[in-house]
Each structure stands twice: as C-alpha cells, then as structure tokens.
Amino acid sequence: MKVRASVKKICEKCSVIKRRGRVMVICVNPKHKQRQG
C-alpha cells in the first residue's frame, strides 16, 4: 500500500474507488495498491 498525495492508475486493471472518504486505487497487482493521505 502506497500512501500518496496524488493517486493515479498505473495499469489498465487499476480502478479508482472511494472508501470512507478516501480515494484509493485497487488492482489485481498488489504493488499498485494506493491510497490518498
């Protein structure tokens, strides 16, 4: 899980979602997991 100021899709399988008011990126590749903070 990377915590970043700006979250972006890294590959085409990444999807940007909102959970509990936080913007997150979830993907089949666990290295692509990000959250805004």
Swiss-Prot record:
* Pfam entry (one): Ribosomal_L36
Question: What is one Gene Ontology biological process annotated in the Swiss-Prot or TrEMBL record?
Answer: translation
A GO molecular-function annotation: structural constituent of ribosome
> Is Phosphoprotein among the key words of this record?
no
Sorted alphabetically, the Gene Ontology cellular component annotations on this record are: cytoplasm; ribonucleoprotein complex; ribosome
Q: What PROSITE patterns does the annotation carry? A: RIBOSOMAL_L36 (PS00828)
What keywords sit in the KW lines? Ribonucleoprotein, Ribosomal protein
Keyword Ribosomal protein recorded: yes
Q: Which family does it belong to?
A: Belongs to the bacterial ribosomal protein bL36 family.
Which PANTHER family is this protein grouped with? 50S RIBOSOMAL PROTEIN L36, CHLOROPLASTIC, LARGE RIBOSOMAL SUBUNIT PROTEIN BL36C
Q: Mind telling me which HAMAP family this protein's record contains? A: Ribosomal_bL36
Question: Mind telling me what this protein is named?
Answer: Large ribosomal subunit protein bL36
What is the organism of origin for this protein?
Nostoc punctiforme (strain ATCC 29133 / PCC 73102)
- State the encoding gene: rpmJ
